[in-house]
């Protein structure tokens, strides 16, 4: 019997139905996508780390665009330089050294793994927490609880320069804030020293049966929605950013089995957040995000104009909850970074240049 050698050919050109060539037909398609900014080739320009939760696939795109132009080139070689990612990924520069670090889910522990970016001549990461990120409760340090079904918010919530974490707690429908104490204790942001700050950030609660939001709750003086005795349904996504230019972070919230993002606006103070109103048709009544299930949002500069744009895709990896040809929605920011105005551009960002067989 003869022998055969199989050779991968990824340079075969493919055209779409309009007879236009696809830029990266063999990248493998996209389904339930998460997008992060990361300088992959160390040229000082943010590229795209894309993560498909269906299959835990890493797809890397080099930024080739000029100012005001979105132009990306798929480059598979960088995927092997990215640490293992499971279920979700967020890149933030937690130690303020100018390099984006990686936060991802810790399989088996319902927690967070952190990889510090130690790139010099090549892209390189070092794991800095074992086996998971911890937070201080009154009884001592414990696992900072985040499930595989939730996408946490990691941002400077209190304005002191280090990265805090917002997520739903173990029980109940309230938002936990884990405050990073690095600046308070050490005078710099290079430590991951967390302390549970409040179990009811924003005075807001989510129904344990739907995506209904209850405002002005949790504490005396408000409508006490519910005790913490009943576990909520699992599955929510956070994007934490100032959306109305008042100096306070707001939330874009996605929820399992629901196709929208709700914008929750914070009108409280740095020390005591208070969600007082919300937009259920974000980012607009004629072009609101409306997917099969549970959008997750990314706030990144897609077209190199200095303004953060909005990318949304289903977080739920279920095969019936994303559509492989139009599951990455791109909204261009025509406003400001802390007061964005989003214009809908396409529902197939990057994936329109790929073959996806299912």
Language model segments and positions:
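Beta-propeller-forming repeat regions
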Residues: 1-358
């Amino acid at each position: 019997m003869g022998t055969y050698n199989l050779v991968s050919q990824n340079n075969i050109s493919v055209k779409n139905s309009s007879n236009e060539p696809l830029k990266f037909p063999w990248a493998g398609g996209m389904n339930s996508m998460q997008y992060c900014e990361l300088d992959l080739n160390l040229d000082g320009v943010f590229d795209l780390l894309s993560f498909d939760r269906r299959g835990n696939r890493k797809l890397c795109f080099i930024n080739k665009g000029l100012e005001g132009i979105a132009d990306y080139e798929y480059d598979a070689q960088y995927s092997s330089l990215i640490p293992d990612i499971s279920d979700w990924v967020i890149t933030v520069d937690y130690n303020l050294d100018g390099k984006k670090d990686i936060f991802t889910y810790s399989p088996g522990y319902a927690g967070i793994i952190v990889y510090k970016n130690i790139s010099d001549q090549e892209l390189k990461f070092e794991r800095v927490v074992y086996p998971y990120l911890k937070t201080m409760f009154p009884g001592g340090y414990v696992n900072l609880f985040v499930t595989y079904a939730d996408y946490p918010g990691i941002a400077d919530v209190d304005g002191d320069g280090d990265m805090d974490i917002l997520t739903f707690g173990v029980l109940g429908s309230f938002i936990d804030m884990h405050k990073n104490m690095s600046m308070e204790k050490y005078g710099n942001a290079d430590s991951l020293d967390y302390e549970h700050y409040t179990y009811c950030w924003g005075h807001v609660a989510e129904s344990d049966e739907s995506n209904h939001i209850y405002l002005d709750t949790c504490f005396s003086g408000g409508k006490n929605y519910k005790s913490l005795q009943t576990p909520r349904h699992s599955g929510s996504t956070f994007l934490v950013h100032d959306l109305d230019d008042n100096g306070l972070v707001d939330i874009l919230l996605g929820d399992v089995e629901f196709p929208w993002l709700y914008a929750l606006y914070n009108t409280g103070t740095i020390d005591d957040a208070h969600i007082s109103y919300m937009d259920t048709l974000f980012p607009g009544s004629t072009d609101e995000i409306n997917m099969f299930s549970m959008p997750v949002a990314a706030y990144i500069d897609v077209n190199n104009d200095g303004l953060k744009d909005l990318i949304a895709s289903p977080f739920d990896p279920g095969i019936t909850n994303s559509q492989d040809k139009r599951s990455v929605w791109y909204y261009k920011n025509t406003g400001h970074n802390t007061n964005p105005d989003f214009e809908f551009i396409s529902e197939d960002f990057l994936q329109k240049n790929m073959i996806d067989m299912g």
